[in-house]
Amino acid sequence: MENVSKPGSRQRSSLHYLFCGLFRRRSTLRGAGSFLAQCLPVFLSLLLLPALLGSCRRDAVPDADPADGQDPPVVVVDSVLTQIRVQADGRPVRRLDLFIYEADGLRALEKQYAFDELQEELNIPTLPGEKLVVGIANSPKRFNSKALERYDAMEQLSFNFADDDPAQPILGGFALTRREACEVQLQPLLCGIRLARVSNTMDGYELLENPRVRLRDLPNSAEILRLLEFRPAELIDAGAWTPLPYDVGFFSQDPGITLWCYPNDTPEDVLGVPRPYLEFECSIRGTNCSFEVPLPPLSRGCMKEVELTIDGPGSHSYNIR
């Protein structure tokens, strides 16, 4: 039978024998160690293949349009310098807190600052638009900014009378900016009742012995930003007694005593809401006697003077100015 070879078969056979011969020759010359050295790059390529494929994945951030050829626009928030003046009328300030609220919308808190002393003039960068600026001085406690992030909450902020100090009274005030400027006038909550004079008109030169004075029905707290209509929800029954320096005899005495309370401007003709009153106590011929002086409506930060005249154990008169 005639052997028929297909075209190209001789060429494949020659290549096969050539490859086998080369492989046998390499194996003879270099041995098994040379074969492992040749395979090592293949193994390394297989190990690096997942990392190379991962580096080819697209980024999650969309690319800029190459046709644009420009950087993305930068959003710039405009700001203005707001001039704030703070006045305390010479009262001592050991700490000043400033709160800047937006005047419109939700009236949200925009900025808050704290200073160790009075800052009479400040230039503060704010967002454009009218602002409500609140100043509080000599606060006995630190503020919770989260609780005061709306102006409505600031309007309800109250301080307790027991935490106030006449030597460094709590001060507060607010103002609305006009053309990026405002002036905040800080005012105290405390009202002062000064016993200006005590007179003894009794016959027989009886003395008013061991005299002392105090206030009763004191408001327990007050809102720091309120200007009018102070209606206390809770009262303190009585303040501490303050003794007069001397017994009161023939000559009138000016004790120079000032008693303090929070405001209560309830009109005198309104029933059911007690107002503070001054209580004067002394001993007359061995008998303890008490005299009451109802106080007029007390506005925020006011000062009243009381002149008291004792005519006998059950008789007295007074003048308030």
What are the language-model segments listed below?
Residues S34, C39, L53, P62, ...:
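Short stretches within intrinsically disordered, low-complexity N-terminal or propeptide regions
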Residues P50-Q83, L195, G301, E307-G312, ...:
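Bacterial Sec-dependent N-terminal signal peptides
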Residues A153-G192, A196-N200, E292-R321:
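Extracellular beta-sheet/turn segments enriched in Thr/Pro/Gly and aliphatic residues
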Residues K6, R285-N288, D311:
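Extracellular low-complexity Ser/Thr/Asn/Gly-rich intrinsically disordered segments
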Residues F19-L22, P41, R58, P263, ...:
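Residue-level detector of bioactive/disordered segments in secreted/extracellular proteins
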Residues T82-R85, G90-L148, N200-C302, I320:
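Tryptophan-paired
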Residues M1-G54:
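Sec-dependent bacterial lipoprotein signal peptides
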